[in-house]
A protein has these predicted regions:
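Acidic/glycine-rich C-terminal interaction modules and beta/coil loop segments
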Residues: 1-113
Length: 113
């Protein structure tokens, strides 16, 4: 049997269409969070990141997708944490060229090619 309603990912997944975009994930630094190379990340740029959110950030000339750890903000830095023990956290302080690009709200996987 098939679903009676058609799927509309724009309607079903995107709350802020003007500020939402997608990007294809490259790399394996978030595999323990279930985000794998080739997945599609749906990113909402209108959201302020909260501690523990998965974000896309621009760090010193490169994009990365990581958990954001804001618990060290009073000490003057934040950390971007991978979900793969083979990688180290990224320590961000005032000397870094850092910008939160958006908050990951969904990921989409392709299971069959």
């Amino acid at each position: 049997d098939y679903l009676h309603d058609s799927l509309d990912f724009n309607r079903d997944l995107i709350k802020n269409p003007e500020a939402t975009f997608y990007g294809r994930v490259s790399g394996d630094s978030m595999i323990e969070a279930g985000i794998c190379d080739g997945d599609i990340a749906v990113i909402d740029r209108s959201l302020q990141p909260s501690d523990g959110d998965i974000i896309v950030a621009f760090v010193n000339g490169e994009f990365t997708i990581k958990y954001i750890d804001l618990s060290h903000k009073p000490e003057g830095y934040i950390e971007l944490r991978p979900a793969n023990h083979a990688y180290s956290p990224i320590h961000i302080d005032a000397d870094d060229n850092f910008r939160v690009w958006g908050v990951v709200v969904w990921t989409i996987k392709q299971w069959r090619r």
